[in-house]
Amino acid sequence: MKKQLYRIVTGILAVAWMCLIFSFSNQPATESSKVSGGLCHRLVERANDTLHLDMTEKQQLAMAEKIEYPVRKAAHMTEYAILGLLSFAFYRGLLKKEKRQFLAALLTAAVYAATDEFHQYFIPGRSAEVMDVCIDTLGASIGLAILFFTLKVVRKHCQKSKLTLQ
């Protein structure tokens, strides 16, 4: 019963995260740009105030524009890192071998990234880019790699302490 509840909860979390990604992708380009542009401008404003950079409003806008692309891509990578982790949690309750859990999670994120890009093709002002699928999949890979090495370190520590972690 516990395993079944775990599968249901982790499955719901992964699907809910996919829905969130879908909702972001469903925004027309103008709306999406307005959101990310506003965020970048607030980040630059905050940095200017905190670090006492004395940038003019024009310089702040130019800097916000300059960082918008990397900020957007970092956000995509983060979205897909989280999707990779949630998918791993789901497959953890479904598959026995850990290697298969990692591979299934990565494959799920990669396939979802591809379908998400296909979906964006039909949104006004948006396009489908193979490079974005690669960036999203890289995000999932990084999230899963961090998890893999964290588990490795924790297990090593637990062995030294004679604890078990499964």
Where are these regions (language model features)?
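Small-polar-interrupted transmembrane alpha-helices in polytopic inner-membrane proteins
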Residues: 16-21, 102-121
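Membrane-helix interface segments
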Residues: 4-8, 96-104, 126-130
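Membrane-interfacial, low-structure loops and terminal tails that flank and connect transmembrane helices
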Residues: 158-166
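Membrane-interfacial alpha-helical segments at the cytosolic side of multi-pass membrane proteins
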Residues: 80-93, 138-154
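"…centered on the first transmembrane helix and the immediately adjacent amphipathic helix/loop
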Residues: 2-79
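Interfacial helix-loop-helix junctions of multi-pass membrane proteins
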Residues: 113-137
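Membrane-interface loop-to-helix entry segments
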Residues: 69-85, 130-138
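Post-HEXXH active-site segment of zinc metalloproteases
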Residues: 87-109
